[in-house]
Amino acid sequence: MVSESHHEALAAPPVTTVATVLPSNATEPASPGEGKEDAFSKLKEKFMNELHKIPLPPWALIAIAIVAVLLVLTCCFCICKKCLFKKKNKKKGKEKGGKNAINMKDVKDLGKTMKDQALKDDDAETGLTDGEEKEEPKEEEKLGKLQYSLDYDFQNNQLLVGIIQAAELPALDMGGTSDPYVKVFLLPDKKKKFETKVHRKTLNPVFNEQFTFKVPYSELGGKTLVMAVYDFDRFSKHDIIGEFKVPMNTVDFGHVTEEWRDLQSAEKEEQEKLGDICFSLRYVPTAGKLTVVILEAKNLKKMDVGGLSDPYVKIHLMQNGKRLKKKKTTIKKNTLNPYYNESFSFEVPFEQIQKVQVVVTVLDYDKIGKNDAIGKVFVGYNSTGAELRHWSDMLANPRRPIAQWHTLQVEEEVDAMLAVKK
């Protein structure tokens, strides 16, 4: 029995032993994660093998990798920022409707726009409507009025003109006042002009001055009396406030005429251009020496038949209406733009320098007849405008020559100013 059972046991197949020996992966399929890990491991191993072949130290390779990554990130950042900026600009353009776009025409029209706006603001402050705006210029034409008198002395053939007073003059100065004076002259010759004294800071000056014109009664009817009110300006051209004209053939000289007349806007008469002259002034106080250098002239009036002139310059040193010294330049033939560069010196003590006048006259030389004056100008005591500035600059800069251009004036007008302002 024992032998039989033992024999059966030896004859039976070893099932359990076979089952334990078989591996699990032989009976179950591999998972996807495990396949990817194997591929990555192989790629990593291959990359490291190639990396070890490069003849660079590991730290250098790491630095190169970092720089490459930074470059890529920078490019991405710039691209994103540019896209966002374009979107913002488009939105702003749509919202604002192109208000920020200013062209050259807008810039050029800026001044005009501001001026128009200022006028509108003025109208708003005064409460004017559009309909009233058209009538406003008529009210602005009120320039004040002037009282005068006229008489004729038949025994002495003299026209007597009295300038009595002015009233309601407009304010032309910054302080809300004016410095008025009156010019009186006869047309058409304008040879003799008179001026009243300047009354400072007033709109209602009282003059009470009389002027005399020597005119035969037979010639008086063809003349017109002009009375013009000016605002005196020490450092620039005097502004005309207004004027009026009185034809002499409309005046009854059988009695004295005295009346008020409203001032009207002055007619813009084109003054005959006589030319310009340039000269320098230099004063040395310690030596009492005044030096005048006549440099050049330009655009002189044509005096000769051929359309040219033979100009030369006279320089007079004057005080209290008296000629103290006289000098003159050489004659420049056939030219309207002469160049001189000639120097003249005068002895003027320091205590007298503010009391003298330098009168510069440009004349046309004539061999046969009288030398005709082209134009004239004076600097020094009682000068005004550009002439006063030139004189003041000379005194403010002793020992230094100060050159300046001056516009020539009619000889008779300058002589009248010199005679009145003694």
Curated annotation (Swiss-Prot):
Q: Where is the composition biased (Acidic residues)?
A: 122-134
Per the record, residues carrying Phosphotyrosine are 230
Where does this protein reside within or beyond the cell?
Answer: Cytoplasmic vesicle, Secretory vesicle membrane; Cytoplasmic vesicle, Secretory vesicle, Synaptic vesicle membrane; Cytoplasmic vesicle, Secretory vesicle, Chromaffin granule membrane; Cytoplasm
Q: Reply yes or no: does the keyword Lipoprotein apply.
A: yes
Q: In which tissues is it expressed?
A: Expressed in melanocytes.
UniProt keyword annotation of Membrane present: yes
Q: Which residues are recorded as binding Ca(2+) 2? A: 172-173, 231, 233, 239
Q: How is the cofactor bound?
A: Binds 3 Ca(2+) ions per subunit. The ions are bound to the C2 domains.
Sample GO molecular function, one term: syntaxin-3 binding
Q: Which residues bind Ca(2+) 5?
A: 304, 364, 366, 372
Chain segments carrying region Phospholipid binding: 136-382
Any matching Pfam family: C2
Q: Which UniProt keywords apply?
A: Calcium, Cytoplasm, Cytoplasmic vesicle, Differentiation, Disease variant, Glycoprotein, Lipoprotein, Membrane, Metal-binding, Palmitate, Phosphoprotein, Repeat, Synapse, Transmembrane, Transmembrane helix
Q: Where is the lipid attached (S-palmitoyl cysteine)?
A: 75-76, 78, 80, 83
GO terms of biological process kind: calcium-dependent activation of synaptic vesicle fusion; cell differentiation; cellular response to calcium ion; chemical synaptic transmission; detection of calcium ion; fast, calcium ion-dependent exocytosis of neurotransmitter; membraneless organelle assembly; neurotransmitter secretion
What PROSITE patterns has UniProt attached to this entry? C2
Instruction: List every position bearing Phosphoserine.
Output: 265, 343, 345
Which residue intervals make up region (Disordered)?
113-142
So which disease is it linked with?
Baker-Gordon syndrome: An autosomal dominant neurodevelopmental disorder characterized by infantile hypotonia, congenital ophthalmic abnormalities, involuntary and hyperkinetic movements, stereotypic behavior, poor or absent speech, EEG abnormalities, and global developmental delay varying in severity from moderate to profound. Behavioral characteristics include sleep disturbance and episodic agitation.
* Free-text note regarding domains: The first C2 domain mediates Ca(2+)-dependent phospholipid binding.
Entry similarity comment: Belongs to the synaptotagmin family.
What does the UniProt function comment say about this protein? Calcium sensor that participates in triggering neurotransmitter release at the synapse. May have a regulatory role in the membrane interactions during trafficking of synaptic vesicles at the active zone of the synapse. It binds acidic phospholipids with a specificity that requires the presence of both an acidic head group and a diacyl backbone. A Ca(2+)-dependent interaction between synaptotagmin and putative receptors for activated protein kinase C has also been reported. It can bind to at least three additional proteins in a Ca(2+)-independent manner; these are neurexins, syntaxin and AP2.
Q: How does it assemble?
A: Homotetramer. Heterodimer; heterodimerizes with SYT2 in presence of calcium. Interacts with SCAMP5. Interacts with STON2. Forms a complex with SV2B, syntaxin 1 and SNAP25. Interacts with SV2A, SV2B and SV2C. Interacts with RIMS1. Interacts with PRRT2. Interacts with DNAJC5 in a phosphorylation-dependent manner. Interacts (via N-terminus) with RAB3A. Interacts with SYT12. Interacts with calmodulin. Interacts with DNM1 (via C-terminal proline-rich domain (PRD)); this interaction facilitates vesicle fission during clathrin-mediated endocytosis (CME).
Protein name (record)? Synaptotagmin-1
